Amino acid sequence: MKIDINLNDDNKNYSVFIDELKNLKFKGKVAVITNSKVGGLYLGEILNLIDADEIFSVCIPDGEQYKNLAMIEYILEQLFVSRLERNSTLIALGGGVISDMTGFAASIYERGINFINIPTTLLAQVDASVGGKTGVNNKFGKNLIGTFYQPKAVYCETKFLNSLPNREFNAGMAEVIKMATMFDKDFFKFIQDNSVENSQILKQIIAKCVEIKAGVVAKDEKESGIRAVLNYGHTFAHVIEMQTNYKKFLHGEAVAIGINMANHLACKLGLLSKKDLDIIEQTLIKFGLPTTYRISDEEVFYDSFFLDKKSENKKIKFILPNGIGSYALRNDIDKNSVLDILRMFK
């Protein structure tokens, strides 16, 4: 299966291939960027598929806490030592962290070289590997340092998901539920009514998410408008991740909690019915996802929103469901209304 990402620029257009990974032929050198966990499972298989002048691999530790500038510097040093040139290619083999970091390294190495994504987690296949967002975290927040830089291709292999722990798989389902809640009521019902243990159902879910994201990115590559909707749940999630030092929750788990918080705010504003709020929360719980987080200080939590990339002119932009299958972008919500919701999670 092939899904095209059309950005109205032949230098940026590319395709997402689902279960079509075969031999990969490149001009110049290739470096595969992976982590210690994924490398042990799949690096050898991927290296055997590559035909290039020279092939290298760079293995970094596994975990969101390593998604920082220091690790980018390490990756770049390995590329310089291997003498990669402008016609070289990086391959991201891993989850969302590897995708973000490899894309960022590719965008700044010698002012930009090609890269492709081979995502090995559900979260990366349905979201992180598609759309060209790259970057790292710092002490001020998540993904605050980065670039928009499109891959040359993305290869989503569902067989890679067989080795995922249940917790990792479920974290990816948070992003699937996000897409369905924002954009497609029928897709949401499909998720409710079908088992992801069925490989064909799972393939359909991945394809649908890629199609949704492809449509959004085609309209708004650099998040100046509709693409911000893909951050539903993330305004809250990024604060949760930062407060827990990226160690307590997987990204998708934090997103699930953020979705529930956003939904309570939407319900308070009359955008979402209590019935739909409960339906979405129960769907998250069905996939073993957390929906609560104990906020120790709602004022501190609220102030952290202003570090969010979407905040402008001292106003926080909230992405909220307007029923299931539709969305609302709001930057006019008064502080007390938000604090009321945050106090519900104390």
Curated annotation (Swiss-Prot):
Domain of life: Bacteria
Compartments (UniProt record): Cytoplasm
Record field: catalytic activity: 7-phospho-2-dehydro-3-deoxy-D-arabino-heptonate = 3-dehydroquinate + phosphate
Regions annotated as coiled coil: none
Gene Ontology CC terms, in alphabetical order: cytoplasm
InterPro entries recorded: Dehydroquinate_synthase, DHQ_synth_AroB, DHQ_synth_fam, DHQS/DOIS_N, DHQS_C
GO molecular function term, any single one: 3-dehydroquinate synthase activity
UniProt cofactor(s): Co(2+); Zn(2+); NAD(+)
Keyword annotations: Amino-acid biosynthesis, Aromatic amino acid biosynthesis, Cobalt, Cytoplasm, Lyase, Metal-binding, NAD, Nucleotide-binding, Zinc
Pathway terms, separated by semicolons: Metabolic intermediate biosynthesis; chorismate biosynthesis; chorismate from D-erythrose 4-phosphate and phosphoenolpyruvate: step 2/7
SUPFAM superfamilies: Dehydroquinate synthase-like (SSF56796)
Main function: Catalyzes the conversion of 3-deoxy-D-arabino-heptulosonate 7-phosphate (DAHP) to dehydroquinate (DHQ).
Entry similarity comment: Belongs to the sugar phosphate cyclases superfamily. Dehydroquinate synthase family.
Protein's name in the database: 3-dehydroquinate synthase
